[in-house]
Amino acid sequence: MAKQPNLLIPVNRLTKTKGRLQTFLSEEERIHLTISTLKTVIEASNKAGFITAILTSDKDVISLASDLIVIQEKQELKGLNEQINSALNEMAKDEIVIVHADLPLITAKSLIQLKKASLQTNSIVIAKSFDGGSNAILLKPPKYFSAEYGPGSCAKHHNSAITAGLSATVIDPPELYLDLDTPKDLQKLLATEIGRKSPAGKYLIKIDAIKRLKEANFLDVRGEV
């Protein structure tokens, strides 16, 4: 019997991806950036030894993930949280990780670190984003979890876990700290050498994003992007 997936990557429709970047990047550029970070997340998951599943309704994403398990979104469900809660029923029952698809610096090591942060059952570990989101969550087990993604989701997930009697831990490894939603996020990525050398960083440099950031006054404290 095939093993059930234990890491879930939700992926929005590519034509709807990165809406907060639509005044900064063209649709084609936003799609390319999304695919770039998705490939980075998939690679990290596979190298860390997870059985990866993609949650999506996008045919192009399904084609891209042809060698992975695909859980198709259900039309009758509304919003990301309902889709994730439903998808968890099709996955492993003892331990699951949920990871955003837009983490440009994620590594296998950071996912293993997330896993090691939970040394007991009935626990949740949240990798917090710099703006208070939940970039990655380990659920051990997932049966007590209800997704609350959106603004401030890290605090919401943490508080819900405590209320449910679970052990809750928040970590902030640099590889899981940054997701790409806004021009400011692109600036944060391109302000570091490791960010510029990432696949997403290389693509952004290729399309002159640094010049665009400077023109839009997205500068760091050194006056550089």
Segments (PLM) and residue ranges:
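Short, glycine-/small-residue-rich phosphate/pyrophosphate-handling segment
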Residues: 139-161
